[in-house]
Amino acid sequence: MLQPARRKYRKEQKGRNTGIATRGNSVAFGDFGLKSTDRGRLTARQIEAARRAISRHVKRGGRIWIRVFPDKPISTKPAEVRMGNGKGNPEYYVAEIQPGKVLYEIVGVPEELAREAFRLAAAKLPLRTTFVSRQIGA
């Protein structure tokens, strides 16, 4: 499961996820990518589930890059605990996703295989996504 090795502070404020992705919005490493067209949060479990779906479909071919990392802690209070008495403990980590962010990239497989692998991965994610390919000469 992906999570930060160390953090300066254990807990973080909720914040607001606004704007569009200005970084990580183009295919940089592979030939094909899965790009988010939606705004939201991806948990470490969702990122891993989609990665497994891609890996299983392409079998031994290709190289996969995960372009997002869950570095924001989400804290929750236990069930049936009254309000107050401080903030709950960090339960899991999420990656904040803006529209336009490339989530996964792949190289070394035909386009049709990559499309199908990303379609299976997209079913595991709570965001709308689109298939993108590298811009030649860019």
From Swiss-Prot:
HAMAP family tied to this protein: Ribosomal_uL16 (MF_01342)
Keywords: Ribonucleoprotein, Ribosomal protein, RNA-binding, rRNA-binding, tRNA-binding
Presence of keyword Heme: no
Cysteine-cysteine disulfides: none
Gene Ontology terms for molecular function: rRNA binding; structural constituent of ribosome; tRNA binding
The protein's name: Large ribosomal subunit protein uL16
Native species: Delftia acidovorans (strain DSM 14801 / SPH-1)
Record SUPFAM superfamilies: Ribosomal protein L16p/L10e
Residue numbers spanned by region Disordered: 1-22
Gene Ontology CC entries for this record: cytosolic large ribosomal subunit
Key word RNA-binding present: yes
